[in-house]
Amino acid sequence: MGGISITQLLIIASIVVVLFGTKKLRGLGSDLGASIKGFKKSMSEDDNTTSTSSDKSSQDADFTAPPIEPKANLACPDEAKNKDKEHV
């Protein structure tokens, strides 16, 4: 009831052929095939690069954080309050 039958698909295909012509559809099909081939090729190249990069990442470097030194030039909070009182 809600599906598309074979006869409806044939009617749609014949309308598409009449509208676009066989040459244009043939060119469209070859372009689609070439793009799928290129996609598969790039995916296989990506798999090869990830396998070599995983070998490199297995030897991680040891990163150490630099020691945090407290700042010696901090003024006492009492001195800061006294300076504020002098300005008032």
From Swiss-Prot:
Keywords: Cell inner membrane, Cell membrane, Membrane, Protein transport, Translocation, Transmembrane, Transmembrane helix, Transport. It is a single-pass membrane protein. It is found in: Cell inner membrane. Residues 49-62 have a biased composition (Low complexity). It comes from the Bacteria. Residues 39-88 are annotated as: Disordered. Residues 78-88 have a biased composition (Basic and acidic residues). GO terms for molecular function: protein transmembrane transporter activity. Its main location: membrane. GO terms for biological process: protein transport by the Tat complex. The chain crosses the membrane at residues 1-21. GO terms for cellular component: TAT protein transport complex. Belongs to the TatA/E family. The Tat system comprises two distinct complexes: a TatABC complex, containing multiple copies of TatA, TatB and TatC subunits, and a separate TatA complex, containing only TatA subunits. Substrates initially bind to the TatABC complex, which probably triggers association of the separate TatA complex to form the active translocon. Part of the twin-arginine translocation (Tat) system that transports large folded proteins containing a characteristic twin-arginine motif in their signal peptide across membranes. TatA could form the protein-conducting channel of the Tat system. This is Sec-independent protein translocase protein TatA. It comes from Sodalis glossinidius (strain morsitans). The lineage of its organism: Bacteria, Pseudomonadati, Pseudomonadota, Gammaproteobacteria, Enterobacterales.
